[in-house]
Amino acid sequence: INGPNLNLLGKRNPTVYGDVGFDEYLAANNFAGVELDYYQSNVEGEIINMLQSSDADAIILNAGGYAHTSVAIRDAVEAISVPVVEVHISNIAAREAFRHESLISPVAIGCIFGFGLKSYDLAIDYFVNHFKV
């Protein structure tokens, strides 16, 4: 599940987020045979609805800027039984001070950030190796 502005990957600030769009990233990888469903929304409530209605074995969540501001998304992650790994493309600890704290991190089972789109690969590897998804 990708949050706000991640629909602009490949176009938005490529020095921070890279020059590859998410659809291109998905098409270029087979993800070790793991079945993936992809969802992106710029709307907080839609992200919450997707978290609450998911029947997935695991969720990779990049809430974008909502990671730093949305108590509602944080509470949704805490409320569901599906394990969630929080990812960020950029190294949020090395960016502006307001990006240093994630409200989601304390309720996710883990956090991966700063490795570009490889952050998603690392989250998938974690779930495959630890949850046998």
Name these PLM-found stretches:
Residues 1-5:
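N-terminal nucleotide-binding beta1-loop-alpha1 segment
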Residues 6-23:
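Glycine- and acidic-residue-enriched helix-capping/strand-helix junction motifs
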Residues 35-45:
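Short beta->alpha junction loops
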Residues 37-38, 85, 94-133:
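Short, glycine-/small-residue-rich phosphate/pyrophosphate-handling segment
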Residues 42-43, 65, 115:
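Short beta->alpha linker loops
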Residues 46-50:
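Short acidic active-site motifs
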Residues 54-55, 78-79, 101-106:
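Short, hinge-like loop/turn segments at secondary-structure boundaries
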Residues 58-93:
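Mid-chain, well-packed structural core segment of small domains
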